[in-house]
Amino acid sequence: MLQNPIHLRLERLESWQHVTFMACLCERMYPNYAMFCKQTEFGDGQIYRRILDLIWETLTVKDAKVNFDSQLEKFEEAIPAADDYDLYGVYPAIDACVALSELMHSRLSGETLEHAIEVSKTSITTVAMLEMTQAGREMTDEELKTNPAVEQEWDIQWEIFRLLADCEERDIELIKGLRTDLREAGEGNIGINFQQ
């Protein structure tokens, strides 16, 4: 779908920067999952929050150990099936789950670049699909590139990227600041507000 130069630039970042980038985007997708769980009483919306908190912990606490195999297993049961719901909200919720799964797989494999690119694409796809659904039609990549909501999502991804790219080494305060800012904003990538 939508390509962006950010996907090439991510190659310049180190593993911890990729993981932080992915965690930031998952933080912005969390409200989509939490709201879906609340509306449908599906599963435990807090499992996403708990796993994401563990990922932040691995970024900020020296020698933090997490069994991501076990977390991934638990999480797979918390992913809704699109066919079970006649509700648009299931799609952004699934996208949020795909992104968090990518992030966990990156922690298991140690391969962070390709997963960071996938999380970026997943987040932008969530935004683009909502825009097309609201418009009631498919849009070309050219139309989507100039769509204000899509532009805003790219701008936020670039802003996170720049903050991370400016770091010479792992900056715990920056990581904590990003987490706090995104959590306090409480707004998802498609405008859902969900304060925890």
Label the predicted regions.
Residues 2, 12-153:
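Structured binding/interaction patches within domain cores
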Residues 124-196:
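C-terminal auxiliary extensions adjacent to catalytic cores
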